Amino acid sequence: MFAKLENLELKFEDLEQQLSSAEVFNDQDRYRKLTKAHADLKQVVDAFRRYKEMKQNLADNKELLGDSDHEIRAMAHEEIKAIEAALPDIEQELKILLLPRDPMDDKNILLEIRAGTGGEEASLFAADLFRMYTRYAEIMGWKVEVLSASDSDTGGYKEIIALIAGDKVYSRLKYESGTHRVQRVPATEAQGRIHTSAATVAVMPEAEEVDVDIRPDDLRIDVYRASGAGGQHVNKTESAVRITHLPTGIVVACQDEKSQHKNKAKAMKVLISRVLQAEQERAHSVIADARRALVGSGDRSERIRTYNYPQSRITDHRINLTLYSLDKVMEGELAPLVDALVTHAQTEALKAQADAS
């Protein structure tokens, strides 16, 4: 492990030298690539330097144990105790930082939320989830762009698809995919009975065209008249677009914009990411049906998380974490959940690494 860390530090120092060069600065494409490589290494190199400094301090204080002055020996003894207590934590941090990175972690995401079982209440919950993720994005300084939305009669969403763009979005939200279950008294419930409904969430890394090989011959593009709200524009022009990727059968439709060109661009953005997701899951031999693998069926019994409003309780069933701060979570304070899921994933990866060695 330490030989690898030494090599990373040398690489980091080499990058710093290159970045200080006027020649590199004048080549903006190269400068951006080197800046990103430098930023990717900074955290692990900073931690390694702290570790080396602590080890040096430990050695220095051990030498002081032979000093003739009693007070100096006592101070050295206390320092040694403090350093030895802190070393395991930084060693664990270094092990985590050396874990192989998910190449998708830096990407933006496509967030898809669909109402599952529970009728109109499920569509209202889908809207609540979208608001929760939007608030979290605001806290993180990310941007949210709605690509497609299908409204329900009560002001919820049957389905909504959005692009969330910013720093390392996928690394933070990739664990949100699955069925989310809600337990609460609907506004329309006269008897005050608690109902259970569900919504599915799918988080996919935003794919660029270079990530996926999609040939024009693989696409069938249909245009049709938009339906739903829209005033005089509705049914006047064929602005809605439906794109089918023939090899996979993936279909994406968009009618939110008045321009057929804009609808096509939005639909292609979603399609490319769905095809990439399907290719990745097929490559990992998860299952043939990529969409079902990602989110489940939307049935209440298949859930990754439960939101219990009467008890203000939120439980993530994958890691057995329960928090009694549902109101804060729904206002976008997702960090305690996300941090716990990231830590769990890192711990599992370390266990797998140890088992393999």
Curated annotation (Swiss-Prot):
Protein biosynthesis in keyword set: yes
One of the record's GO cellular component terms: cytoplasm
Disulfide bonds listed in the record: none
SMART domains linked to this entry: PCRF
Keyword presence, Cytoplasm: yes
PTM annotation (N5-methylglutamine): residues: 232
InterPro entries hit by this protein: PCRF (IPR005139), Pep_chain_release_fac_I (IPR000352), Pep_chain_release_fac_I_sf (IPR045853), Prokaryotic/Mito_RF (IPR050057), RF-1 (IPR004373)
PTM description: Methylated by PrmC. Methylation increases the termination efficiency of RF1.
Keywords assigned: Cytoplasm, Methylation, Protein biosynthesis
Any one GO molecular function term: translation release factor activity, codon specific
A Pfam family per the record: PCRF
Localization: Cytoplasm
Task of the protein: Peptide chain release factor 1 directs the termination of translation in response to the peptide chain termination codons UAG and UAA.
Family under the similarity heading: Belongs to the prokaryotic/mitochondrial release factor family.
Identification of the protein by name: Peptide chain release factor 1
